[in-house]
Regions:
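Extended, compositionally simple hydrophobic/Ser/Thr-rich segments
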Residues: 1-149
Length: 149
């Protein structure tokens, strides 16, 4: 298995760790995914009030969330990128990334844990909270906020 795709209130859950070089999961339209993944690269996408709860061990992890969706991650990655919009949420306080780049807009909220370098860009009433001893590059506009947990 290299990908999971759930839509229209579907639910996918697994008790075993899924191993792949590249892994992708996509949830939309109130769907739910609960999974554990070990991969070189992992792509996580959620939209339209869907939920993803994943344990991820990866070299790189990309996250996209929109339209009131919620992604919860635990595990680790050397590099993580996250783009969130439209009241979506990323809860990744238990997901440790060495390098992290986070962009939020339109009331989206992100919580991340970064150990080396963080680039945070928050706009339009969105927020980014971070933990970890990392160097930061922060941009805020139109009521966006960035702060340490």
């Amino acid at each position: 298995i290299r990908a999971l795709d759930a839509s229209s209130a579907a639910k996918i859950s697994g008790d075993v760790v899924l191993n792949a070089d590249k892994f992708a999961m996509d949830a939309s339209s109130v769907a739910k995914i609960y999974v554990s993944v070990k991969a070189q690269s992992c792509a996580v996408a959620a939209s339209s009030a869907s939920k993803i709860n994943a344990s991820v061990e990866a070299v790189s992890c990309s996250v996209e969330a929109s339209s009131a969706s919620k992604i919860t991650l635990k595990g680790s990655a050397a590099k993580c990128t996250a783009d969130l919009s439209s009241a979506s949420k990323l809860s990744a306080g238990d997901f440790v990334a060495a390098e992290c780049s986070v962009n939020t807009s339109s009331a989206a909220k992100a919580v991340v844990n970064c150990t080396e370098r963080l680039h945070a860009d928050a706009s339009s009433g969105s927020s980014i909270r971070y933990s970890g001893d990392c160097r930061t590059s922060i941009n805020k506009s139109s009521g966006g906020s960035v702060g340490r947990n």
